[in-house]
Amino acid sequence: MTLVQKSKVTRGQKGEQTRERILVKSSELFAEKGFFGTATRDIAAAAGLQQPSLFFHFVSKQAIVDELLAYSLSRPKTFAGRLVKESGSAAARLYAYISFDTEHLASSPYDLTGIHQDGLLSMPDFREWKLAGNTLAQHIRTLIRQGHADGSLLPLDPILAQHMISGINLNTMRRVGYKARGKRGLPEFVADFILRGLLSNPRSLPAVQKEGRALLLRLKTAE
């Protein structure tokens, strides 16, 4: 590799590091001050940049949120869609989803709680992510309905149950903080807590745990 090529690689790496720092600092500001309360000059200052330099990496504040929403919603939506098509107990599949989503949020380098406030997904600029969020919610509701059909879950309103699941996950992150990789057992704790309230037979929890964890491992390995 020539000196010129090495220089280009170094600049590229620094650019990626700066972009990542902007995303991290933006997410923290959105969680603290909200989307509308955060100005691009605030983001630039937090990231150690001059405001014009920020726009070299992101053309707008919306572009930053787009990337954070993509991180927040894309993997969980895809994973939940796969679970809907899997066979086996719906309770175990729901357990696998809750564990996956909790781990996804807890291991995030970003504080994702702020981008799910301020009614952002109701804004026309974020319609793509509103649709993605709706699809994810529908997948969760389908799992719940499948649990009604196979008798593994109590016959609760699927919409209410889905909102409770989503709300518990987000509020858990607000409580424990993001970058919670050190919170060992958190995904299992949250999944256990939720399933205890949804199972038609609470005594089936150990079997649901075993099946759900095996399914989670298999699907994550295949990602």
For each predicted feature, which ranges?
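C-terminal peripheral helix-coil segments that are non-catalytic and often amphipathic
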Residues: 1-6, 134, 138-149, 174, ...
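Helix-turn-helix
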Residues: 21, 25, 29-63, 67
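Conserved hydrophobic residue
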Residues: 35-36, 153, 178
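Hydrophobic alpha-helical connector segments
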Residues: 67, 81-110, 165, 210
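Short, basic, alpha-helical segments at the C-terminal edge of helix-turn-helix-like DNA-binding modules
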Residues: 70-77
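Short, well-structured alpha-helical segments
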Residues: 95, 141, 158-166
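Short secondary-structure transition hinges
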Residues: 102-153, 159-160
